[in-house]
Structures are given as C-alpha cells and as structure tokens.
From Swiss-Prot:
The active site is at E243, C278. This is N-succinylglutamate 5-semialdehyde dehydrogenase. It comes from Aliivibrio fischeri (strain ATCC 700601 / ES114) (Vibrio fischeri). Signal peptide: none annotated. Its EC number is 1.2.1.71. The lineage of its organism: Bacteria, Pseudomonadati, Pseudomonadota, Gammaproteobacteria, Vibrionales.
Length: 485
C-alpha cells in the first residue's frame, strides 16, 4: 500500500524508494514511487471530487475533519512511534507532534471563520457581500522534520475551504504519511478528496508541473522552494505558498539576566530536534567581555552534556540523530568549512555513528565573510559584538527572515530590537523555536512569502469574492452624461 489515489491503495510503478531509520539504518518502509502518469491520475481524481466536495455544506466538511481529529487522538501513541522510528526524534517529542496535529485542527476551524468569513452590509442602496471560494486542487508538499504536523497544517485548511488535495510527502518520511492517510480513509472522506503520491524529486516535479493543480502549499528547504518560485513565476493561474528555512539570529544582551535560564533558552533554540527546525537559532550574538565569556563557558559546559540517543532509550535523550547519514555529513562538512574560513570550535560536532551528530558550537567572529547558509542541524555559530546596534545590523545581514530573538531584561533594548530587526517571528526571552499556532508563521526574504503556515494558512486556501447586489435592475433619477433611454 504505497499511494492513495481516487479512494484506492495502489502500488507504485516508478523507482524503488525506502525509508531508513536514522538511528540504526534499518529499512522501515519500502515501495515504488509514483510515475508521472500516476501523479496525473491523482490530480484528476482530486479534480473530479472537487465539485461535490466544495458544494458540501461547511458543517459536513468540518464534521469529517473533526472525525479525523478524534482518530488522531485515539492513535496518538502509534503515530508518535512511527514518527520516532522514521525521523529518529525522541519519543517524548514525537508525542507532542501528534498532540499538535489535533490542536491545529481546532485552530484551522477558527481561522476559517475569522480569515475567510461571509459578510454583508448595505451601502447606497446596494447590498455589499463578501464571500470566499476554494481555489480547486491543492498540491501539498510536506517536510521530513514534522511529517505529521506540518502537512496537516496545510491539508486541513485546504479541506475546510472546500479544496481537494494531492499530498506529496518528503521521501524521507513516507511511512508517517501512509499511516496518517489511513486515518483520513477511516474519517469518511469521499474518494478523491485527498490523494497521496509517494516519491522523490521526479514525483515532486511531476506534481508541480501538472496543469491540473490550482495551488501549491510547500514546506521545505529554500533551495527547493526557490526552484518552485522560478517555475511558477510565469504562471499567474496557480497560487504558490512557500514556508522555507532561515539563518536565524539570536542576540544575547549584556543585561541577559539569570545565567542558567539564558543558557537553557539558547539550548532550546539551537539544539531542540537536533537542530532540525526551520526556526532554530543558527547564529548567536554574544557581547564582548567577561559576561559574554562566562555565558559561553557555561553554554559549552551544558551543551557537551546533552544526551544524544535513539528515540526509545531508557535514559531519555534530548536529541536524536539527523534525518539521514547524508544530513549528518552535511553538518560535519559545514563545520570544516567554517573552520577553514577562520572559525574556532568551542565544542566540536562529532559523528556518533549512523546519522548521529553531537552538538557543535563554533566561534565565527573572525570569519571575514560568513556564509549566509542554513545549516539544518546542531551547529551553532557564535559572533561577538560590542553594541546592540552592531548586533542587530549583523543579525539582519541575511537573505532570510524567518525567526529572531533577543535575550534582555532591558525594555529599551527590546524596543530597539523589535523596531529594527527584519524577521517574521521575533521573540524576547523565549526560545526561537517557540511559536503560537494561532499566530502568523513565516517571514520575508528567502524564508518564503510571509505567512503561509499556521493560522494564516486559511488565506492561501480561498480567494475573496466581492459582490454588489440588488433585487432588480434600476434606472437612476439622473442618467449618466451622454446617455438617453
């Protein structure tokens, strides 16, 4: 059972793909990818289901989505176990992902009413009406780091608005999507409303290239997102929503307050999920002087004692592995590159076997031209600064703009920071990876097109229809100049 198309499970006809557990390299899922013809079949199924689905009263669509939420609750532990086996994230963490899926459904229902409501008013003898209509067939591209939660945050708003969906998950996490699709199957969803196509690059290209989709909701790397952006540049008939990564800065003020609380906030920002969250801190700005020295010494001491292990270890880990051996090698190579440019490792990231990498901290202050890259893993770059204005200027020196943070007990510093920083998510004295599901999620620049996830995803799933209405045509008391009747 590999692909879910038009209400049936079908075997793939393309190249073989498999999912390897990153903590022991065992095969946890195997199948054949969808061919271009199978992708077209999935899109056609979604198109055929669209008219009846959008005509279904909202309350009926909501009932099916809420039934899915109940099934997720009932199967939360098994979902969490699959995600842990496939991504390597600690079991305690994947349990929170299953819970977040349920929470996002309630948020999406509220967002539908608040972001895409029906409104009417009277003006100059006319009834002015605002309605919202679904776009049609939506392609959803899911990432590997939150393979349940993040696709769910696009699928649910799309369905509530009356769209149908073709999901193409990351080739790193096909098992998770298959398990979740079976819950949608049990929810009473009509055939063709959601379709699942598994595969790697060729499958994704086939889905993005097809003329049959009306929009694409993407969460993933900036490189892939930019390819899609260029591809869609001449096609105004398709909506493209991009939620990509960031080279996220975290500035520590001299007035940072409690030392251990600050260190804890940094660790949660940089190393949670083994650094595989798009909002993770990548650059840490620390003041010059003894205060900064003491902070870094304590940070290194705490970080080197972070417990890294497989998800189900009896001694509960804080961090698991990278998603793959290739991803682990990428982080180690990034460290070597920064060292060659003049960076000094305060704590060297090391391979721990399979896809495990220990967290690393590197002082990049003396790197003349710091690469503006997202190192998607547990590698934190430290840059020393002298003034807050300098720190903010350096923090803004990136093409990205997803998340940023300031640790400071000084209100005036926060006022300056929030006024001058360029980022979509800006936190004070809280981890960068902390974000509210009912707030905008996204950022400017290379991080995407501003707010395509979380609460505001509703905006991307329906278009506004403005109407001026009257019961019958009327002739005004005074005709327009040059006109006679």
């Amino acid at each position: 059972m590999t692909h879910w198309i038009a209400g049936d499970w079908v075997l793939g006809e393309g190249e073989t793909i498999q999912s390897l557990s990153p903590y022991n390299s065992e095969v946890v899922w195997k199948g054949e990818s969808a061919t271009e013809a199978q992708v077209e079949s999935a899109v056609n199924a979604a198109r055929n289901a669209f008219i009846e689905w959008k005509k279904l009263p909202f309350e009926n669509r909501q009932a099916i989505v809420e039934r899915f939420a109940e099934l997720v609750k009932e199967n939360a532990d098994s979902i969490a176990e699959v995600i842990a086996k496939e991504t390597g994230k600690p079991f305690w963490e994947t349990k929170t992902e299953a819970g977040a899926m349920v929470g996002k459904i309630a948020i999406s229902i509220r967002a539908y009413h608040e972001r895409t409501p029906y409104k009417e008013r009277e003006a100059a003898g006319n009834k002015i009406v605002l309605r919202h209509r679904p776009l049609g067939v939506m392609a959803v591209f899911g990432p590997y780091n939150f393979p349940g939660h993040l696709p769910n945050g696009h699928i649910v708003p799309a369905l509530l608005a009356g769209n149908t969906v073709v999901l193409k998950p990351s080739e790193q996490t096909p098992w998770t999507s298959e398990v979740i699709m079976k819950l949608w199957q049990k929810s009473g969803l009509p055939k063709g409303v959601i379709n699942l196509v598994q595969g790697a690059r060729a499958t994704g290209e086939a889905l993005a290239n097809t003329k049959g989709i009306d929009g694409l909701l993407f969460t993933g790397s900036a490189n892939t997102g930019h390819i899609l952006h260029r591809q869609f540049a001449g096609d105004t008939g398709k909506m493209l929503a991009l939620e990509m990564g960031g080279n996220n800065p975290m500035v520590i003020s001299k007035a940072f307050g409690d030392l251990d609380a600050t260190v804890y906030t940094i660790v949660q920002s940089a190393f949670i999920s083994a650094g595989q969250r798009c909002t993770c801190a990548r650059r840490l700005y620390v003041p010059e002087g003894k205060q900064g020295d003491a902070l870094l010494a304590r940070l290194v001491d705490v970080t080197k004692n972070i417990h890294v292990d497989q998800p189900f270890s009896e001694t509960t880990p804080f961090m698991g592995p990278q998603i793959s051996i290739a991803a682990a090698e990428f982080i180690l190579n990034a460290q070597k590159k920064l060292q060659a440019l003049g960076g000094e490792s305060l704590l060297e990231a090391r391979s721990l076997g399979h896809a495990f990498v220990s967290p690393g901290i590197i002082d990049a202050t003396n790197v003349a031209e710091l690469p503006d890259e997202e190192y998607f893993g547990p590698l934190l770059q430290v840059i020393r600064y002298t003034t807050l204005a300098q720190a903010v200027e350096l923090a803004n020196d990136t093409r990205y703009g997803l998340s940023a943070g300031l640790v400071s007990t000084d209100d005036s510093e926060w006022d300056y920071f929030v006024e001058h920083i360029r980022s979509g998510i800006v936190n004070r004295n809280r981890q960068l990876t902390g974000a509210s599901g009912d707030a905008p999620f996204g950022g400017p620049g290379a991080s995407g097109n501003l707010k395509p996830s979380a609460y505001y995803a509703a905006d991307y799933c329906a278009y506004p229809m403005a109407s001026m209405e009257g019961d019958a045509c009327e002739i005004p008391e005074q005709l327009s100049p040059g006109l006679t009747l």
